[in-house]
Amino acid sequence: MSWSAFRTFTDPDAYHAAISGTHAHADGVVAARGNFRADLGTIQPDRVLLRHAGATLPRTTYSAIDPRQFAIAFATDPRQQIYISGLELVPDAIIVFRTASEGHNRFSASRWNSVALPHEDVATAGQTLIGRELIAPPLTHLIKPSPPLFSKLVKLDKAVGQLAEAAPEVLASAEVARAFEEALIRVMIQCLSESQEIEVPSPHWRHVAVMRRLENFLEANPDRTLHLTDLCAAAAASDRTLRILCHQHLGMSPTRYLWLRRMHLARRALRVADPTKTTVTEIATSYAFWELGRFAVAYRSLFGEPPSATLRLPPEDPQKISGSPWRLPE
């Protein structure tokens, strides 16, 4: 049975939480000042899951793909910048995720779409349409379909999204949903089987492993005062290497990312806290912000409001986020 949902957001935590409810997980930091606006459309005719998403401010995220899903993604505007695990999503290219892929992504103000399908359905469709089963690649990589084939994918994906938003009752028809789904699966299989793979330099995945070690260390130590030497030791990388990789994968220095990450975790805690039982001081110090005056000034500069105002706000999403914000739920 088909279903769809379209939502808009002004809170990045609520936006990432909504993505996390659709066979993926993402969380991270907004990397620039300004008013955050985002939207997320989720459409599932039956087995295929489509996501249409966009945000107005640059972001750096750490995301994971549901291990049960074979997923691809593409940008919808060639002028924007998107990097997936350090790979630039160039115009008219498709990112094909390995099973249970996870890594850092960075976005300019941008829009992206994704198509996901259970692995067994992709294998079956491959056998039916091209005479061989298709499986997820061992490593996430980019492919470049022919311009007509890529255009076909984009237009079909867009048509399904527009129909789901404007006339969901039409897509609710089993016959209509099945027709769209079969067309989507067919063009997805064509892209996977007929496109040219974009070569990735061999050291790239060693660099991804360095960044994963860094993220794991930061996740395990949210309330510690950390220094660059700590980050280098945890990532098993030299100062120079870590700085270079952070600029490639995160778009910023390691210390800037650490600071932004802690600021966003503090903001998340303020958003879900009970103002009658919790103080700004308690939350700030729990994330190793010991100079409260500097914290308040930096917080207001980054988020456009003092931390006390955030504490008084009701959560945008009524479902509180529990557990680690950087891990895919079981």
Question: What does each model-identified segment do?
Answer:
Residues 33-36, 44, 48-65:
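Conserved short histidine dyad/triad with adjacent acidic residue
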Residues 242, 246, 294-295, 299:
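Short hydrophobic/aromatic patch on the recognition helix
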Residues 42, 50-52, 72, 94-96, ...:
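Conserved hydrophobic/aromatic beta-strand scaffold that supports enzyme active sites
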Residues 56, 75-77, 118:
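Solvent-exposed residues in well-ordered beta-strands and their adjoining turns
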Residues 1-35, 81-222, 227-229, 233-239, ...:
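Alpha-helical bundle regulatory/interaction domains
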Residues 250, 258, 262-267, 300-303:
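C-terminal flanking helix
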Residues 65, 207, 259:
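Short, conserved glycine- and acidic-residue-centered signature motifs
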Residues 64-80:
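Short, conserved beta-strand element in jelly-roll/cupin
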